[in-house]
Amino acid sequence: MRKLYVKIFALSLICSQLIAPLKTLAQENQLVEVSGTVVDHESKQALPGVGVTIKGTVAGTTTDQKGNFKLRSKLKFPFYLVFSSVGFQTQEFQVKDLGAKLNIELETQSLLFNEVVITASRVPENILKSPVAIEKLDIRALRSSPAPSFYDALENVKGVQMTTASLTFKIPNTRGFNIPSNYRFMQLVDGIDMQAATLGVPLGNAIGPTELDIASIEITPGAASALYGMNAINGMSNLITKSPFLYQGLSFYQKGGINHLGGTGRDASGLSETAIRYAKAFNDKFAFKVNLSYLRGTDWLSDTRTDQNPNNLKSANPAFAALSGANNVAYDGWNKYGDDVLAGSNTVSLSGLTINGKPNQTLNVARTGYWEKDLVNPIVDNLKFDAAVHYRIGENTELSYDYRIGKMDGVFQRGNKIQLDNVIIQNHKLELKGSNFLVRAYMSLENSGDSYNVKPLADNLDLASGGSNSAWGTKYKTALNNYATQNGGLLTDQNLAAATAFARQQADAGRVEPGTPAFDALKKTIIGVNNWDIKSSTIPNATETGGAALVQRSRLYHVEGQWDLSKQVKYFNLLVGGDARVYEIIPDGNSFVDFSRPIADRGTPLADGSFGKNIYYKKVGAFTQLTKTLFQERLKIFGS
């Protein structure tokens, strides 16, 4: 009997030793539920929308309207919970076991010295420890901004200037490069480059987030090219959107306003913007969000009448004082196209004239041209949609897919202006991120829709309805001489202004005028033609009217990754990364051509409708970043 007890005791001891590790493993991997309430330390009122995350992981949730939260995850004790909310100090709380319900009190924070930024070093860090100058606008700053939209609030950031080319097209600039198209200022949304591949610049916030989905904006007004490439040599901005895990529910806003009050040239008009957002998370593992917005308004019309080519310039007619001011026959209007004397086009030189009794006199005369307000459409809109799906693979890893699409109208300015009409930009992004790594791939697609170039439109309106420059010049000279014959046979300072006005009227006979059905019909025809040349003996493949269409279709493929090796390196923090990018340009036979085809055939479509082989541009890059803190983090050495 005693032997039996000994055997049973030995067997029990062995089983307990085998079960103990399994029990420990089960404890380490058991599903732990932590719940509690978050309140304001001073008022003791519940705080809704407080972010609750597990430190060192991607797991998290937010408090409800009563300040309550519940978080389930497979954890090992002890662990830390991080509580954060706009306007309150971030607080960490250690959870040692499954005890009572947590009661957390957050203290208000008036000075945002402990804000965390990501853009400066590609890793989270205190804004005061950032190695470069960086500005951050969080939700509280954006809400309190007097700007009409969060995107306009960028103009209030130190070192940033905003250039407004159109109601839907606003361009942030830094370092004094205040130009309509800042190619070296990178604009990111959650790390994605928003540029349109063929235009080379982002189209404002055409497919960016709405105010309902923006979490913060980080702006680096100085060079950031070491970590982000040459496109960031003038600086960069990163628009960071809300996580569907942390910001759930349904949101909606409607804005309305009136612009051009008290202005001239047109009546006041309405401005409207509508947006809706919905986000939902399931079991802290899966979450999604959708955003939809629509903006519509009437753009400002450029209508400056300043003469860029006054009569005292050599490109005008300085020898004839009678042709000064309103009588300038070489007038080059600021917001007029088709009269571009200073550009060396749209002008004729009339020689062999006798003026004031002097033979062999020459007049420089500009074509009449068209005002910009008659060539562009001031009614603009911006419709955009985005959706995202997030899945937490583990405590430290999250996989997400984002899709964005936007349609916009507006005016884009380079050497001259481009009317953007039904431009569509799309973006697909797939991202895998962990506590110390990130892999991201995205694709952008651009389609310029029904856009057109304003200058060739004006040129071809004149050329198609008023004749070539030489033919128009001949009619002008003939009318000038006829006027002289009918008025004593002489051209003098006294009648030169009236004579040139009569000659222009005769030369413009048959020219289509704005506001007429003939003008609208010819304008529509020219906009639909993707060849800016008019048919002639030297350009036999062009159309009779010429064209102004801007047909640009392109794709951008990008992949990047980064790895934080700080835990593997003992003496300093090390971050490595790299990227690769491919631009795919589809030839249109006008703006972009297939150079492998004969010159005469590059503007002619092939049997399949294409204009040749697609054009590819490739880029690869890599970076290394080392940081070391010394003297109890009072000194930070940084190199990249």
What do these predicted ranges mean?
Residues 58-68:
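Short, acidic Ser/Thr/Gly-rich low-complexity loop/linker segments typical of extracellular
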